[in-house]
Amino acid sequence: MTKEKKKTGIEPKVFFPPLIIVGILCWLTVRDLDAANVVINAVFSYVTNVWGWAFEWYMVVMLFGWFWLVFGPYAKKRLGNEPPEFSTASWIFMMFASCTSAAVLFWGSIEIYYYISTPPFALEPNSTGAKELGLAYSLFHWGPLPWATYSFLSVAFAYFFFVRKMDVIRPSSTLVPLVGEKHAKGLFGTIVDNFYLVALIFAMGTSLGLATPLVTECMQWLFGIPHTLQLDAIIITCWIILNAICVACGLQKGVKIASDVRSYLSFLMLGWVFIVSGASFIMNYFTDSVGMLLMYLPRMLFYTDAVGKGGFPQGWTVFYWAWWVIYAIQMSIFLARISRGRTVRELCFGMVMGLTASTWILWTVLGSNTLLLMDKNIINIPNLIEQYGVARAIIETWAALPLSTATMWGFFILCFIATVTLINACSYTLAMSTCREVRDGEEPPLLVRIGWSILVGIIGIVLLALGGLKPIQTAIIAGGCPLFFVNIMVTLSFIKDAKQNWKD
């Protein structure tokens, strides 16, 4: 019994370092918020201006890697000997479900405003040209390019899972072919895993920092409860307690049902916005934006604005590429797990087409609605942001729709459920990654899951206390830097091992 407990307990070398590092950073931040904001601005400026080009080249190289997988020697290779575990329709639906987080609802509703008010290519703010390019840039940041990079890593993890039969819960497990077993299981592998976990903790904290204000603003609109930082903290605490109860009482089936409800409700809410906002305008704007994307794509891919120094690519493209990089391993492991039995070509095409369709639908519908409300002077987003914050501006884009009370209830429920499932997924992923071994069908220890959910909640509160989007953007970019190198190593390890062991 003691041996079994030891086997399934925490792995100290990957549990305590991230806990200590994140704890110290949170403590230093809370000690002096003003000094923390100065450091945040300096880190953001350094990484985006000095290393922004590296993120852009990474995405381009991975896109070529996607073409190599689709048309190269591994295209028809099957990821496992079994037939596909899920039907194609269910597989695509599960992909869509992974795209409907509250953080995505946050950016989908407000992103276009920033692109129009501070446009790229020295365009005039709020001009026709800026509006024509606004949605095109959203389609660029949330389109085939990042999903192609994810598909490459998903193939890599699926290969290690189903072809090489490796039990991969941390990235170091995949690096044996590249650096050897001694280094992968030694100090080097431990450092890699700690980089991954620290970055993942901050990424999840930022998602919570984006999602929570949406829920509290909904509560203010529906119930008249003033939105304060204290209310944000109370809501996060309630989510953590609810997650602990679900885990302790074995209510994971209920969480799964909630996740399904989130997906169906997302379809319903998007359909409602599409119909009442103006379906013909949305389709025309989308069509025009695809054309703009194709016309400007080469410029977008390599745009650093080194001469003009307007800051658009640093504030948005580099930020989003870091966002994609930081979530790459977690998302790719999930997408690989549900793709057993697929061929490499099926996985690559399915991900790019299915997931691009999901994000394009979200951004087109929500972004078009925001643009229409701005053009018709129904809402004044700059004033709302200045007086009440970004979350209030997002809420008003939903409240301006017909049947506003019913719409707001739907949005409130969607955001609430999305955040509950987010915290559940966060605690599960971090607990799995910091335990010695969890067999199939077993759950990671309860206290470990609760502990990680508390830490993620604390990070969300700290980021909310700092205020604005810059701390959230900086947390993503700073975390994306080490994961940038980890993702490259996982990719190279897959290529090396596949050449040796995945032959006809």
Swiss-Prot record:
Pathway as given in its UniProt record: Amine and polyamine metabolism; carnitine metabolism
Primary localisation category: membrane
Membrane-topology annotation of the record: Multi-pass membrane protein
Record protein name field: L-carnitine/gamma-butyrobetaine antiporter
Subcellular location: Cell inner membrane
Molecular-function GO term, any one: (R)-carnitine:4-(trimethylammonio)butanoate antiporter activity
Similarity annotation: Belongs to the BCCT transporter (TC 2.A.15) family. CaiT subfamily.
One GO CC term on file: plasma membrane
Pfam hit, one: BCCT
Gene (UniProt): caiT
Lineage top rank: taxon: Bacteria
Reaction equations catalysed: 4-(trimethylamino)butanoate(in) + (R)-carnitine(out) = 4-(trimethylamino)butanoate(out) + (R)-carnitine(in)
Keywords per UniProt: Antiport, Cell inner membrane, Cell membrane, Membrane, Transmembrane, Transmembrane helix, Transport
TM ranges: 10-30, 51-71, 92-112, 143-163, 195-215, 231-251, 263-283, 316-336, 347-367, 403-423, 446-466, 475-495
Alphabetized InterPro entries for the sequence: BCCT_CS, BCCT_transptr, BCCT_transptr_CaiT
Known partners and oligomeric status: Homotrimer.
GO terms (BP aspect): 4-(trimethylammonio)butanoate transport; carnitine metabolic process
Function (record text): Catalyzes the exchange of L-carnitine for gamma-butyrobetaine.
